[in-house]
Design a protein with these regions (language model features):
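Structural core segment of the AMP-binding/adenylate-forming
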Residues: 1-35
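Adenylate-forming
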Residues: 1-9, 25, 125-127, 140, ...
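A short helix->loop->beta-strand "cap" motif at the edges of active sites that frequently abuts
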Residues: 13-19, 120, 168-171
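Conserved pre-ATP/AMP-binding loop-to-beta segment of ANL
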Residues: 21, 27, 37-59, 66, ...
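Conserved S/T- and glycine-rich ATP-binding loop of Class I adenylate-forming
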Residues: 54, 60-63, 96, 139, ...
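Conserved G/P- and acidic residue-centered "switch" motifs that form tight phosphate/ATP-binding loops
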Residues: 63, 119, 177
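Conserved AMP-binding/adenylation subdomain of ANL enzymes
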Residues: 78-95, 99-145, 160
Length: 191
């Protein structure tokens, strides 16, 4: 279904040169992404760039209509030093986890750029479906120092018998995406 939609859209997309697909049914003329990755070199040729060069494109959520492209340049990650250092309070040689799927902008600004620049080790923990027990067990096991998640995740975490987990290594927690109700804040702070 998605392939058919893309095929119908291609005539209107004059700048698209190639389409890469993951899967078994790859249309004629399209690229097999996995085969391309397997055939790629392990060496990356660094291409000179300036801070004003285009780096990535986000897409808005489309709350006022169709999603819009938001272009970011190479100076963009530097802005998130402030995010990591002063909001998330990551520290050099600390262990940081932001709960965010890679499809969200928060994945980049809340989990990679400023955090690495500030010297934190980043925890890559992606599961198919959120499970509060598994998450709390991980936080206890790895001795996390900073943690960022949407308030919904904090609400699920406090529904577990959270006192049985040793989360004493966590020095700072932060939220993003929605308001955090006081009950959840105070319960988590008690730990």
């Amino acid at each position: 279904e998605m392939i058919d939609y893309i095929k119908k859209s291609l005539p209107d997309c004059k700048t698209v040169n190639n389409v890469a697909v993951v899967g078994k049914k790859i249309p004629d003329g399209w690229l097999d992404l996995r085969a391309g990755i397997a055939a790629s070199s392990d060496e990356l040729e660094r291409i000179p760039n300036k801070s004003t060069d285009e780096m990535l494109i986000y897409f808005s959520s489309g709350t006022t209509g169709m999603p819009k492209m938001i272009l970011r340049d190479y100076s963009y990650p530097l802005g998130h030093i402030i995010t990591a250092k002063y909001w998330q309070r990551v520290r050099e040689n600390g262990l940081h986890l932001t709960m965010s799927d890679s499809g969200w902008a928060k994945f980049a600004w809340g989990k990679i750029y400023g955090q690495w620049i500030c010297g934190a080790t980043i925890v890559a923990y992606d599961n198919e479906k959120f499970n509060a027990h598994n998450t709390l067990s991980l936080l206890q096991e790895i001795k996390l120092t900073s943690f960022c998640a949407p308030p919904t995740i904090f609400r699920f975490l406090i529904k577990e018998d959270i006192a049985k987990y040793d989360l004493s290594s966590i020095e700072h927690c932060s939220i993003a995406g929605e308001p955090l109700n006081p009950e959840v804040f105070y319960k988590f702070r008690e730990l």
